[in-house]
Amino acid sequence: MITKNKTISKLKRLLFSLLLPAAITTAIPLQAQTCTSKLPCQLRIASYNIQHGVGMDQKLDYKRIADILEGISPDVVAVQEVDSMTRRTGNTYSLGEIADHMRYYASYAPAISFDGGKYGIGILSRKRPIRTEQHALPGREEARTLLVAEFDDYVFAATHLSLTEADLMASISIIENVAKKYDKPFIIAGDLNAQPDSPFIKKFQKSFHICNNKGKSWPADNPRECLDYIAVYKSYGDVRRPG
């Protein structure tokens, strides 16, 4: 399995918080900016790569992750690098453990079989989704997936994209075709494995408005690159940064 050796700390890891009312506000972690959008609801959204629940101290600690998330009180969270019933996590359902601590709903999408169990992505949500669906995405070095959860007022998708540029570019049309199916705001969040000036992000932004401020998010102990994003599908309405 090929993945970046991403780490988390007890008190600091990339956590986008995003408000989606008549305006969109993003903070990472203390900086802020505002965007405008025709959205019917107010949401706080986070994206968190948990590295199978193990922190920079090499300790598996689901409650620590839950505590960090509860500190920003998100409505919905995109979660990456999530184990389910693997030996290295003691045969636990990692997303369910975090959800239990937070009293949230857990939606899981395995991408590959690994270490006696599964490895993939998930969504934690304050409200129960109306429905969820999973879509395969290109991944030459490792299978990738898109998890979509529909709620009353919006649709939320979580993903962790490939490290390969060709796979990244091929993923855009798949994600866009999924977004087109819905007549409500479609929001996507996750680890896109691409920097803001990359060909992928430039093409991605033709269909999706990136709402976070593109602050550096990786590696956690000394962030040098922006790889994590929250974005809204543009076809729903006008989404722009004022000024």
Where are these regions (language model features)?
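Active-site flanking residues adjacent to catalytic metal/cofactor-binding acidic residues
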Residues: 48, 80, 159, 189-191
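N-terminal, active-site-proximal structural segment of metallo-dependent hydrolase catalytic domains
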Residues: 2, 7-14, 28-101, 113-115, ...
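Metal-dependent phosphoester-hydrolase catalytic domains
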Residues: 34-35, 134-135, 167, 177-187, ...
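Catalytic metal-binding/acid-base residues of hydrolase active sites
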Residues: 51, 83, 162, 192-195
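Active-site-proximal beta-strand elements of phosphoester/diester hydrolases
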Residues: 42-54, 133, 148-162
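Alpha-helical elements of Rossmann-like donor-binding domains used by nucleotide-donor carbohydrate transfer enzymes
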Residues: 63-68, 97, 148, 173-178, ...
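Structured beta-strand-rich core segments of catalytic domains in phosphoester-bond hydrolases
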Residues: 35, 57-58, 82-154, 242-243
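Bacterial N-terminal signal peptides
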Residues: 15-27
